[in-house]
């Protein structure tokens, strides 16, 4: 036994002897860093000190001359550069890039091309020693280590794929605002998201290599720039402050207009008042890192006042853009093309832009999704060549039509990847901003989004499933992470079919018949599928509960937040609504639906006050944002209409990737069964099936409810046994009824009846894409009478 231990010890020692940089527990380390480094670098060093102490139980000291780790921002004026005799050419000319390189004599170099690059390099060291970016925000307590090593010759050089990468805190009324003002910094008046909270947000952003921030802006929240200490905190962390589509010129209009504006927020009838409102803020923040949103909408996510037609609105916007740039030229930089600006064609503004609005060449055009993950416009060749470049404003949380999804963070990571990769490939590479709601519980989607913005090639090469697995293994260990992967994939798949928030078959903002749309109704599914869905969710929930019992005590809080609450919350919401549907038809006792509701209440109480972190997240989680009817205990009513019957005349049913032949690109994880495909423009896929004794068949096609990639159309044709149809369209417009139905079921639907010969022994049905952006999910052939 002693011989075995000695041999093992010698093997370990030999490994360390070969390593060129090594750290042992119990040994303090010194970091060499110039006092001239900017504040964000020192903030990163503070975080690394904390991380090092948590992992190795020892301290980090900063020195001007001697140390194990050398931290440097390359500059012609930095004396450390000459003494190192290192080739820094790989960093020169790049923004926010860093190099980590093992040197001789057990030293490690962390070099940045600028302040951000150096800070990100330091945070990369934290990741390398095993600290999760979510160590504070999801209570992923770092594991203790005995040692850390890097081999001889180790070097990594990283630079961002997207220049500005950030998050938007939004719809904060029931989560972050209440948590901040009632729990985390309660010594100020309610409604305040102050510098203590924002520092935690900026720490997270630094760990996730984000540099762009849209602060919370609802009427319930004290505006960012009116809260003492917020501006200064952003400067310390090197954060660029921006604003949403209705917050031009760094002004949180929803609240600030009523505080410091005069008259109506109307550039037709009160241009001087609005101009002075903007001027006051620009003068105040002129020396800070601001990405100025330009343009104008209504006070809070509505159309501008004073102009009714598209033509009138375009003329007003042209004047607005001219005057706003005049302010920037006067107070920020006389060369206005050097002031970062962004124009956001959101909702009705896209129609104004498409009518011929001229946006200055140096301004970034920030395109938007439809609030449910499907991008409405991709840059044309001309737009891709603009000096200002292109950006994206994307949602994984939303308040609005056809229904909110603010609660559980079930947005499909596979859809996020597919749409953003397509956006990047089509030139959207300047700015990415993600609407994250309250941050929690969208932790994984945030990390995936920002990882793509940092290194899109690496995420693409790995794939989303491998990225998710790495996330789970990092947070919960190799074995449990591997076990969790299929569970989380199934969790996202079931929510892809219908989000938990959509399970009441209700809608919001239907002003003409609001009572009907707010009333919980039957889902359009058969009894068989309803039972299957409950079984699938129960299986997930049971597996999660078993794993929870195996999680070490120091990671139980993290597991509850990242896995248990979202999976079991979604399970109970589905059970509540499905059991209620059976009860309405007299096929089940109402108590089972009520019990599911009670389980949601209990889970949420645990999240806020009952887990081991002793109320750290109290007021953060609300299972009924906006108090919508879908979140209530279901009212006990009876109905006489029969439930939807199972389709009985099916000839064949396929997921798109199960086609017999053809040209297609698989879409990892997308679709009802995760087997959707992209059919390239001009290509087709084929489905072969045997003889049928019918003279007509019904062809049902289910597509991703996406928007055109080029031009204004999504078209395809069907050919059955050599006979082709005319062009079939399935694009949607605005907030049409078809678009709403598509979003709620997450499929676009087309059905066509075709004649068929009963004399043929086999048949071939071909689906051909006429436009780019055709994503087929499923196909069903049914007998037609």
Regions of interest found by a model, annotated:
Residues 109-112, 175-176, 180-195, 211-221, ...:
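The substrate-binding groove and active-site-proximal loops of carbohydrate-active enzymes
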Residues 134-191, 196-216, 388-391:
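An acidic-aromatic substrate-binding cleft motif
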Residues 140, 144-145, 468-620, 624:
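C-terminal non-catalytic alpha-helical accessory regions
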Residues 143-148, 225, 233-236, 260-387, ...:
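Gly/Pro-rich turn-and-neighbor structural signature
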Residues 617-785:
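Extracytoplasmic
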């Amino acid at each position: 036994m002693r011989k075995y231990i000695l041999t093992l010890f010698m093997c370990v020692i030999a490994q360390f002897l070969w390593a060129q940089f090594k750290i042992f527990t119990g040994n303090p380390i010194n970091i060499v860093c110039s006092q001239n480094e900017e504040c964000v670098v020192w903030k990163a060093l503070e975080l690394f000190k904390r991380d090092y102490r948590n992992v190795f139980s020892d301290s980090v000291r900063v020195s001007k001359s001697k140390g194990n780790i050398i931290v440097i921002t390359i500059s012609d004026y930095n004396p450390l550069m000459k003494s190192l005799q290192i080739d820094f050419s790989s960093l020169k000319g790049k923004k926010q890039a860093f190099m980590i390189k093992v040197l001789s004599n057990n030293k490690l170099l962390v070099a940045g091309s600028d302040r951000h690059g150096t800070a990100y390099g330091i945070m990369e060291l934290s990741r390398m020693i095993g600290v999760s970016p979510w160590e504070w925000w999801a209570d992923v307590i770092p594991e203790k280590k005995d040692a850390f090593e890097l081999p001889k010759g180790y070097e990594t050089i990283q630079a961002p794929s997207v220049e500005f990468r950030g998050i938007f805190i939004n719809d904060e009324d029931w989560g972050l605002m209440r948590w901040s003002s009632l729990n985390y910094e309660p010594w100020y008046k309610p409604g305040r998201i102050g510098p203590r909270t924002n520092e935690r947000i900026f720490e997270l952003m630094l760990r996730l290599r984000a540099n762009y921030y849209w602060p919370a802006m609802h009427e319930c929240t004290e505006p960012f720039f009116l809260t003492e200490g917020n501006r200064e905190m952003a400067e310390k962390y090197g954060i660029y402050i921006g604003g949403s589509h209705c917050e031009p010129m760094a002004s949180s209009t929803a609240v600030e207009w009523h505080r410091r504006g005069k008259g109506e927020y109307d550039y037709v009838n009160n241009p001087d008042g609005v101009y002075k409102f903007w001027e006051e803020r620009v003068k105040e923040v002129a020396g800070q890192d601001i990405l100025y949103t330009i343009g104008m909408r209504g006070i809070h996510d509505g159309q501008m006042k004073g102009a009714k037609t598209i033509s009138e609105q375009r003329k007003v916007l042209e004047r607005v853009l001219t005057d706003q740039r005049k302010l920037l030229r006067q107070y920020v930089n006389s060369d206005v093309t050097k002031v970062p600006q962004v124009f956001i064609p959101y909702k009705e503004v896209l129609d104004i832009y498409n009518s011929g609005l001229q946006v200055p060449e140096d301004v970034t055009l920030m395109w938007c999704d439809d609030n449910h993950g499907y991008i409405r416009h991709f840059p044309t060749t001309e737009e891709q060549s603009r000096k200002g470049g292109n950006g994206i404003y994307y949602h994984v949380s939303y308040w609005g039509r056809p229904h909110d999804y603010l609660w559980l963070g079930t947005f499909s990571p596979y859809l996020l990847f597919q749409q953003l990769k397509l956006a990047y490939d089509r030139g959207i590479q300047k700015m990415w901003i993600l609407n994250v709601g309250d941050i929690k519980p969208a932790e994984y989607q945030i990390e995936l989004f920002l990882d793509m913005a940092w290194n899109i090639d690496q995420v693409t090469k790995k794939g989303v499933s491998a990225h998710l697995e790495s996330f789970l293994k990092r947070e919960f260990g190799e074995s449990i992470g591997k076990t969790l992967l299929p569970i989380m994939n199934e969790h996202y798949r079931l929510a892809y079919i219908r989000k938990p928030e959509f399970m009441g078959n209700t809608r919001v903002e239907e002003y003409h018949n609001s009572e009907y749309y707010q009333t919980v109704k039957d889902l359009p599914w058969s009894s068989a599928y309803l039972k299957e869905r409950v079984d699938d969710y129960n299986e997930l929930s049971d597996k999660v509960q078993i794993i929870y019992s195996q999680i070490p005590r120091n990671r139980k809080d993290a597991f509850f937040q990242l896995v248990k609450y979202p999976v079991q919350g979604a399970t109970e919401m589905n059970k509540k609504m499905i059991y209620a549907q059976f009860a309405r038809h007299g096929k089940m006792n109402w108590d089972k639906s009520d019990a599911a509701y009670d389980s949601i209440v209990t889970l949420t109480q645990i999240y806020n006050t009952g887990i081991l972190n002793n109320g750290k997240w109290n007021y953060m989680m609300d299972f009924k944002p906006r108090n919508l009817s879908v979140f209530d205990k279901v009212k006990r009513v009876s109905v006489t209409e029969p439930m939807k019957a199972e389709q009985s005349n099916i000839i064949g049913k396929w997921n798109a990737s199960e086609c017999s032949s053809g040209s297609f690109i698989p879409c990892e994880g997308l679709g009802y069964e995760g087997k959707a495909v992209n059919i390239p423009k001009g290509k087709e896929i084929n489905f072969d099936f045997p003889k049928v004794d019918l003279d007509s068949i019904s062809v049902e096609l289910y597509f991703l409810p996406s928007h055109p990639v080029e031009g204004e159309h999504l078209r395809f044709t069907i050919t059955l046994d050599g006979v082709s149809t005319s062009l079939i369209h399935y694009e949607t417009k605005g907030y049409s009824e078809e678009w709403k139905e598509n979003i709620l079921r997450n499929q676009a639907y087309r059905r066509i009846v075709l004649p068929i010969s009963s004399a043929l022994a086999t048949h071939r049905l071909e689906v051909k894409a006429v436009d780019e952006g055709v994503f087929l999910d499923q196909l069903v052939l049914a007998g037609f009478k």
